[in-house]
Amino acid sequence: MRYHPHTPDDVRAMLDVVGAERVDDLFRSIPQALRLDRPLDLPPAADEIALFSELRRLAARNETAHPPFVGAGCYPHHVPPVVDQLLLRGEFFTAYTPYQPEISQGTLQALFEWQTFVCLLTGMDVSNASMYDGATATAEAALMAGRITGRDKVVVSAALHPEYRKVLATYLRSTGDEIVTVPFGADGRTDLAALAQAVDGRTACVILGYPNFLGVVDALPEAAALARAAGALTVAATAEAVSLGLLQAPGALGADVAVGTFQSFGNPMSFGGPAPGFFATREKSLRQMPGRVAGATVDKQGRRGFVLTLSTREQHIRREKATSNICTNSGLCALASTIHLSLLGKRGLAELARLNHGRARMLRDAMERAGCRPVFSGPYFNEQVFDVGDAEAVVAKLAKRGIVAGAPLARWYPDAPHAKGALLCAATELHGPELIQLFASTVRS
């Protein structure tokens, strides 16, 4: 069956409107020598059975692997099948927030529940309806801090995700704001003495990872105290959101803004994305928050309803008054996270977080028995750096065994301690005891 949307009469009518005799006349600007004057060399059309057979043949060429031990900002977690089934419902299956949002009460309620989950896990007062990802959420936090404080300097921990820092630099290139990077110490935490020297009266905000890129739970309370004393805001960026089921909420530790990604809830790794970014802050900063907010209200009949409010995007108001130019957010990915968190509940999330930390401890014990000691001494959640001697060689060796190992740290930190051997590894609920032992024994051999 051929799928031609236009009848000959449709084509003739359109050509008449533009004053052309033939379809070829539309391409007169292209030199004749560059035009294809024959049909495309394609194989005959396949029926459905033959097509699926060919797809299975191609899929068989892929190498299957165990759950990867690589994290570095994107983590392997179990996604309950019901998440995808609910996402496929026609009412939800779009990344877009409708231009007439009030007619899509289900979508707005889902975003409202997302905001509720974000606030509960971060200890903040308000959340928006999602961001593109953790990196852009972090950059938007720096822009918001500049608007609030009127300052032009951002102090960033070197242990913040390096790719978050790259996106931040891209955003601030046009504003002219200065970025000062503070080193981390032997424990993998931000060097507080260096941070104290870097923070001054020009500082708009201090940004730390929580946990940071090295897997270490950074010194957020101490950093927040230093920032507060200088009149600056503190931004906590979380790439592994399962940690918030075990760690204290960033808001409880003094952070003014909490950002990051909920990829770990309901969203597969998918070669690094997409994944929903989150942005939460104190109520006093509500009107400076980027994006848009789903709010609850009551109509004339006293019925509860949901609306989009505080949409201070440049699509809605004057550019000079806008807080961001974010367009389509990650609504569908945010819905996946909302469904997953609803299924887990408070107790389930706590159990999942404890299980992740337990598997990380199991990995640490196994790696130490294999002669691979941890590089950093600071507290960790489910990710840590080990000295394996030659990280690149270990990754290549394990790949032959069907194991995707961790990420060689030298890719981002060539001058870090034990850089050549430093391997960043994550362990989640998907990494059972047998797989962890296989990983460690293969590294040792």
UniProtKB/Swiss-Prot annotation:
Biological processes annotated in GO: glycine decarboxylation via glycine cleavage system; nucleoside metabolic process
GO molecular function, one term: glycine dehydrogenase (decarboxylating) activity
InterPro entries xrefs: GcvPA, GDC-P_N, GDC_P, PyrdxlP-dep_Trfase, PyrdxlP-dep_Trfase_major, PyrdxlP-dep_Trfase_small
Pfam families reported in the protein's UniProt record: GDC-P (PF02347)
Protein's UniProt keywords contain DNA damage: no
Catalytic reactions on record: N(6)-[(R)-lipoyl]-L-lysyl-[glycine-cleavage complex H protein] + glycine + H(+) = N(6)-[(R)-S(8)-aminomethyldihydrolipoyl]-L-lysyl-[glycine-cleavage complex H protein] + CO2
Transmembrane segments: none
Keyword Oxidoreductase carried by entry: yes
Top EC category: oxidoreductase
Top-rank taxon, per record: Bacteria
Protein EC: 1.4.4.2
Keywords on record: Oxidoreductase
NCBIfam families in alphabetical order: PRK00451.1 (NF001696)
Subunit structure: The glycine cleavage system is composed of four proteins: P, T, L and H. In this organism, the P 'protein' is a heterodimer of two subunits.
Similarity annotation: Belongs to the GcvP family. N-terminal subunit subfamily.
Role noted for this protein: The glycine cleavage system catalyzes the degradation of glycine. The P protein binds the alpha-amino group of glycine through its pyridoxal phosphate cofactor; CO(2) is released and the remaining methylamine moiety is then transferred to the lipoamide cofactor of the H protein.
Name assigned to this protein: Probable glycine dehydrogenase (decarboxylating) subunit 1
Gene source species: Anaeromyxobacter dehalogenans (strain 2CP-1 / ATCC BAA-258)
